[in-house]
């Protein structure tokens, strides 16, 4: 029993340090997506967006399905789907999932996405007034 207590104590100390050491590395790009349509549902809102030059993915089409987690509708979770076609004709397909918050007309999103070429971390904002 004493060894189990020691093991738990070590895990409590080491685990938070491991989380703090997380770093995102690898290829990255910045881009602006234009919201092309918005659909309101009883349990959430769907956004379709596109970009002509999303890094190695080229022309990209996205769908975000946002669901609120509280009555004030200022945060929640979302799932989505993406399709990209590079200038060389390479097709990329993505399953997207993350969290969102809203401050006025700005929605901030973060996600971990499973894409044809691996796992991607994404963060960005959507301005509901400008559509970008």
Where are these regions (language model features)?
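Beta-strand-enriched cores of mature, soluble protein domains
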Residues: 21-132
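Bacterial N-terminal signal peptides that target proteins for export
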Residues: 1-8
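Bacterial N-terminal signal peptides
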Residues: 8-18
């Amino acid at each position: 029993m004493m060894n189990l207590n020691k093991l738990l104590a070590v895990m409590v100390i080491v685990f938070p340090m491991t989380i703090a050491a997380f770093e995102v590395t690898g290829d990255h790009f910045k881009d602006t997506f234009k919201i092309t349509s918005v659909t309101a549902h009883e349990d959430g809102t769907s956004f379709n967006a596109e970009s002509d030059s999303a890094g190695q993915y080229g022309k990209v089409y996205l769908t975000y399905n946002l669901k609120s987690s509280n009555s004030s509708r200022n945060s929640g979770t979302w799932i989505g789907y993406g399709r990209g076609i590079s200038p060389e004709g390479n097709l990329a397909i993505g399953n997207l999932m993350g969290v969102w918050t809203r401050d006025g007309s700005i929605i901030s999103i973060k996600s971990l996405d499973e894409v044809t070429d691996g796992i991607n971390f994404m963060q960005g904002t959507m301005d509901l007034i400008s559509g970008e």
